[in-house]
Swiss-Prot record:
Belongs to the queuine tRNA-ribosyltransferase family. It comes from the Bacteria. Its cofactor is Zn(2+). It is an enzyme of class 2 (transferase). Zn(2+) binds at C308, C310, C313, H339. One of its GO terms (molecular function) is tRNA-guanosine(34) queuine transglycosylase activity. It catalyses: 7-aminomethyl-7-carbaguanine + guanosine(34) in tRNA = 7-aminomethyl-7-carbaguanosine(34) in tRNA + guanine. Pathway: tRNA modification; tRNA-queuosine biosynthesis. This is Queuine tRNA-ribosyltransferase. One of its GO terms (biological process) is tRNA wobble guanine modification. The gene is tgt.
Length: 380
């Protein structure tokens, strides 16, 4: 049996759904699942210190291979002793492969069997990223969990295109496995693609499972499809993945999508959503979305969320936070970002308890009753 650096331990299955309570063991510690992972694109979660992230219960964070390759460079980070030392974070780190960022540069990229040529968004220079290069960068970064280089096809692309794409992604995954220099202390995940086509998802999953990765990601979702379409893809994709390995749904952070992903057997999630909307003064609360910059909060001396015990809600009022944001004070963004991240990390803590109590469906109903059933129409 292969001795993986990343191990999944199942603690309990929920009786009424596909949800599972567990933990993932990594070279930099163990974290409970299901877990939401804050995104630290440039080796920092925007405006948050490592100490603040630990205080809110973030057991793992994500960093971005593409951005760190371009700046400051993966070789510089390797000289610093790896990403953990560079950013002073002693807990697990997951890095993506750069594939999604290249996907988002659709107007300036060219995909071949060898890899992807694209324009550097910082200076316009021509760049080339291959499966081997994506693995080499992540080996230099030293993350605990790495991602295979993949193409993320658009959800509504034609069947023939998506079929060719997933077959190439499988070949890229095999090349990445061969290029992996540190399988003893970095776990490489395969990424299942296939857009909304069940047979292609099945083909992609079968290819990757045969390669025996330490964990598996479900990619190509949260890219414009409806909430119902995402759930349908998870319904037929998650059961294809091994029960004894972690399952990661990439790029998902809306509260209803997190709960629905857990119900379908997902263990890990990430998204820039909580910090991105926080910078515009949009806050997640137990009673739904709150835009604290609105004029009606100018004299509101209550917390962002009466049911939240985070640092922001324990110490500051809506009126004060609104003032900071209107005055372009960074501290305001720090407070809203901390609150939103805490909200999702704490939501997952409640979800884990609901799995333990076998009442996840009741928890979902109660949560959405207060939060609002139309969350999927809010981009939130």
């Amino acid at each position: 049996m292969t001795d993986y650096p990343i191990k999944y331990r199942l603690i309990k299955k929920e009786k009424h759904t596909g949800a599972r309570l567990g933990e993932i063991i990594t070279p930099h510690g163990t974290f409970p699942t299901p877990m939401f992972m804050p995104v630290g694109t440039q080796a920092t979660v925007k405006t948050q210190s490592p100490e603040e992230l630990k205080a809110m219960g973030s057991g793992i964070i994500l960093s971005n291979t593409y951005h760190l390759w371009l700046r400051p460079g993966d070789e510089l980070i390797a000289k610093a002793g790896g990403l953990h030392k560079f950013m002073n974070w002693d807990q697990p780190i997951l890095t993506d492969s750069g594939g999604f960022q290249v996907y988002s540069l659709a107007d300036s990229r060219n995909i071949t069997e060898e890899g992807v040529t694209f324009k550097n968004h910082l200076n316009g220079s021509k760049m080339f990223l291959s499966p081997e290069k994506a693995i080499s960068i992540q080996n230099n970064l030293g993350s605990d969990i790495m991602m295979s280089f993949d193409e993320c096809p658009q959800f509504y692309q034609p069947y023939d295109y998506v079929k060719k794409s997933i077959e190439r992604t499988s070949r890229w995954a095999e090349r990445g496995l061969k290029a992996h220099r540190r399988p003893h202390d970095q776990g490489l995940f395969g990424i299942v693609q296939g857009a909304g086509f069940e047979d292609l998802r099945r083909q992609s999953a079968a290819d990757l499972v045969s390669m025996d990765f330490p964990g598996y990601s479900v990619g190509g979702l949260a890219v414009g499809e409806s909430h119902e379409e995402m759930n349908a893809v998870l319904d037929f994709t998650t059961p294809l993945l091994p029960e004894n390995k972690p399952r990661y749904l990439m790029g998902v952070g809306a509260p209803d999508s997190l709960i629905d992903g857990v119900i379908r057997g997902i263990d890990m999630f990430d998204c820039v959503l909580p910090t991105r909307i926080a910078r515009n003064g949009t806050c997640m609360t137990s009673e739904g979305r709150l835009v604290v910059k609105n004029a009606k909060f100018a004299e509101d001396f209550t917390p962002l969320d009466h049911d939240c015990d985070c640092y922001t809600c324990q110490n500051y009022t809506r009126a004060y936070i609104r003032h900071l944001l209107k005055a372009d004070e960074t501290f305001g963004i720090r407070l809203t970002s901390y609150h939103n991240l805490y909200f999702l990390v704490n939501l997952m803590k409640k979800v884990r308890q609901a799995i333990m109590d076998d009442n996840l469906l009741e928890f979902r109903e109660d949560f959405l009753e207060r939060y609002g059933y139309n969350t999927s129409n809010r981009n939130f």
